[in-house]
Amino acid sequence: MRWVSMRVIKVGGSVLENLEKVFKPEIFRDAVVVHGGSRYVDELAKKLGLNVEKLTSPSGVTFRRTTRKVLDVYIAAVMKANRELVSFLRRQGIEAIGVSGVKEVIIGRRKKLIKAVINGKIMAIRDDYSGIIKEVNVEMIRNYMKVGVPVIAPIAYDPVENVPLNVDGDKVAYHVALALKSRELYFLSDTAFLINGEVIDKIPRNRIEEYFPYSSGGMRKKLLMAKKAIESGVERVIIEGLNGRTVIS
């Protein structure tokens, strides 16, 4: 398997409004960008008076319950984030191209049920529109790369149910990195990996699991994706925040 010298960058929703503070033009050239948008979703839901329930998985990861109404808000919000990120990159001289999962770049399958811990019990929820990523349309992404830097929204398309899906941006970035055989997966977040308030500069590839107990929420998810990416052939994973960077290799 030949891995290519390009990177996949995940721009977290938490840094979209502060991107100029962490923006480095050299890392965005010859790259594919994936982004989040949680803040945008929360803001739009609040504006519309829609209550968005936050749940916790049995593994301790917090996620948004995506009903059909929440899905509509989610798509509108992350596409707004997509437009703003593309606009920012173009102002910096990067020929960015907005890409939506609705255009079948990310193929997914709607989860038949999701599990959440509610009142101390593991419950099954079936009315959810979140998805599992099944396939990345490599040919379509490479065609976009011929003319610029693709900026991919975290939306998948389920061809069986003919519906768009809420998919996690970190997982999209991981799957895109593997599909494109990228050497580097780069997370731009609000913070690097911390222990007791101190940035951990390096994590050896064979010791990632040792750091799991010191992580939670979105950072736990990033470490999980980093472990899977390294095990699958990605050479290094970087978590860069406003306070420094953590290199996993």
Curated annotation (Swiss-Prot):
Pfam families, per database record: AA_kinase
Catalysed reaction, written as an equation: [amino-group carrier protein]-C-terminal-N-(1,4-dicarboxybutan-1-yl)-L-glutamine + ATP = [amino-group carrier protein]-C-terminal-N-(1-carboxy-5-phosphooxy-5-oxopentan-1-yl)-L-glutamine + ADP; [amino-group carrier protein]-C-terminal-gamma-(L-glutamyl)-L-glutamate + ATP = [amino-group carrier protein]-C-terminal-gamma-(5-phospho-L-glutamyl)-L-glutamate + ADP
Pathway(s) the chain acts in: Amino-acid biosynthesis; L-lysine biosynthesis via AAA pathway; L-lysine from L-alpha-aminoadipate (Thermus route): step 2/5; Amino-acid biosynthesis; L-arginine biosynthesis
Domain of life according to the entry: Archaea
EC nos: 2.7.2.17, 2.7.2.19
Chain positions of site Transition state stabilizer: 10, 222
GO cellular component, one term: cytoplasm
A single GO molecular function term of this UniProt record: acetylglutamate kinase activity
InterPro entries cross-referenced by the UniProt entry: AceGlu_kinase-like_sf (IPR036393), AcgluKinase_fam (IPR004662), Asp/Glu/Uridylate_kinase (IPR001048), LysZ (IPR037529)
Gene3D superfamilies for this protein: Acetylglutamate kinase-like
Positions that bind substrate: 64, 166
Family designation: Belongs to the acetylglutamate kinase family. LysZ subfamily.
Function: Involved in both the arginine and lysine biosynthetic pathways. Phosphorylates the LysW-bound precursors glutamate (for arginine biosynthesis), respectively alpha-aminoadipate (for lysine biosynthesis).
Protein name: Putative [LysW]-aminoadipate/[LysW]-glutamate kinase
Natural source organism: Pyrococcus horikoshii (strain ATCC 700860 / DSM 12428 / JCM 9974 / NBRC 100139 / OT-3)
